[in-house]
Amino acid sequence: MDNLQGELVSFPASQQECRISAKIPVSPSEGIEGHCFKVEEDYEEPALQSGTPPFFTKQDYESPPQDTNDLCELQADSSGSGRKEENLQLSKTVRDAMPALEKLLSNDWREILLGTKESLAEKELQLLFMIHQLTRLRDQLLSAHSEHRNMAAMLFEKQQQQMELARQQQEQIVKQQQQLIQQQHKINLLQQQIQHVNMPYVMIPAFPPAQTVTADPQMSLPIQPIPCKPVEYPMSLLHNSTTRGSVSAKRQETSQPLNLTAKPTDQVPNSRSSPKYRMSPVGSQGGSSMDSASSPQKANLPLGFLGEGDAITKAIQEACQLLHGQNTSPEHHQQKYRKELLDTLPEKEVQDGASLQHTEESVLGCNMDIDGSRGSHIKRPMNAFMVWAKDERRKILQAFPDMHNSSISKILGSRWKSMSNAEKQPYYEEQARLSRQHLERYPDYKYKPRPKRTCIVEGKRLRVGEYKALMKNRRQDTRQGYVITSIGALQCPPSPSGFSSQSLLDNLSQLPSSDHYNPQDCNIQVVKSHLLVSHEPHGAIPMAKDICSDSEDSGKSDGELVVITD
């Protein structure tokens, strides 16, 4: 059943305003005659005004779906009986107006509430368009989300790759550092071996006349080369007698400079002007040895680094083979040969040669005196770093015996720099203790720095390098003045094995000059011994009038020879 509410407005001829309110309840009341609806009417007659049309204000009703014939009763709630007639008229009016009202209201309200077909189609199109837009927006959001997720995955993968590359690069850097350390260690070992092997070509060594060569079973073993310090002029190596001992003793002996001017205790002093020459059999594959029962000393010459096809090695091997076939008393023949050689030489040449050799031995003697005077030198007290490095250097040498001293110093310096002050404090305390102890022992000690070394040669002050270059040039000039052909007139002593000095000298004359070779590292003091004789009797060998002195010794005479190193 539909609920309807409306307003009825009528304009009666009497120009009276009437208001009818009709209420039709939802639930019908049942009476004797059947279904009926309750209708309530309120009638009101207000004061009439001229010019204002009367009208119905409001009417509430419920229209049943049946016809108006089904309406049974009209119950009016009025106080008076006079109103019953009016209610009947009103009910008739309502019954007459109900179909028109229903028709009017049904059309308007249905159109408003339900809408027409055109409006529904338009709304459907709008809804479809909105659904399409929402679908597109959803697809865009999904694609953007997937792209964002893919980008995040790609960025994460790139970060992982970069981290992996960085880790690999770090590992490669660590490996390269380790390889560099190993290569540096190998380079140090090779440098040491090169320093041992890289020695100048040597002449035949000069031995004292009372010393004889004995058979040494150790000479067939490979000979260890001796480390050298660099010099600017070539010299022949003297005999170096070493005792076989522990490895540490060998290191200490090779690290110290050799005293070449000291004479052996079991040999007899002899004239310096005419030294006697002996051959030391050393080759690349081993050499022969010479026997003698008069002296127990053993001769080892470090010539193992020379090649097999070297002219020096061939000459020395040939001389050794010739000397090996001599009789048991070679001293007699050699003394006789030396005497005859001195007799045949002019007196001036002998004196010049003796003076040249005396000059060179005097230089070595000065060095000996200087080295000997160093024993009275007062050393400075050790500082904290030296105290700490003393034990650390020993530990590194025990772990790496072949490591170079420069590498050890670099390692110690970096370690000391990385130490904290608290770790260095005990060593500073030890430094203070050593300083106090040194002050107690030497109260008058004053540190004097080493003076600059200068040489005065023929009234000119020269540096040490200039002095060495000058001496080298003089030795070259002296060597060029010798004539080998003048030795052919000398008388050689007879030899039962057919040994002749001429063949030996011919072999020596073919040897390459050692003046063009500058050794890199030589720690051995050497003496140049000349076999050849000057052709010119006078002026071939100049007298040495060189003075090597310190800055405060410049007033000494030209004939005095002084070398000061400290």
UniProtKB/Swiss-Prot annotation:
Q: Determine if Transcription is one of this entry's keywords.
A: yes
The family database entries (CDD domains) matched by this protein are listed as: HMG-box_SoxD (cd22030)
Q: State the Gene Ontology terms under molecular function.
A: sequence-specific DNA binding
Q: Where in the cell is it found?
A: Nucleus
Pfam family of the protein (one): HMG_box
Query: Which residue ranges carry the DNA-binding annotation?
Result: 378-446
- Give the UniProt keywords, A-Z: DNA-binding, Nucleus, Transcription, Transcription regulation
Entry's Gene Ontology cellular component terms = nucleus
Q: Does the keyword Iron apply?
A: no
What is the protein's quaternary organization? Homodimer.
**Known function:** Transcription factor that binds to DNA at the consensus sequence 5'-AACAAT-3'.
Report what the protein is called.
Transcription factor Sox-13
Which organism does this sequence originate in? Xenopus tropicalis (Western clawed frog)
- Gene expressing this chain: sox13
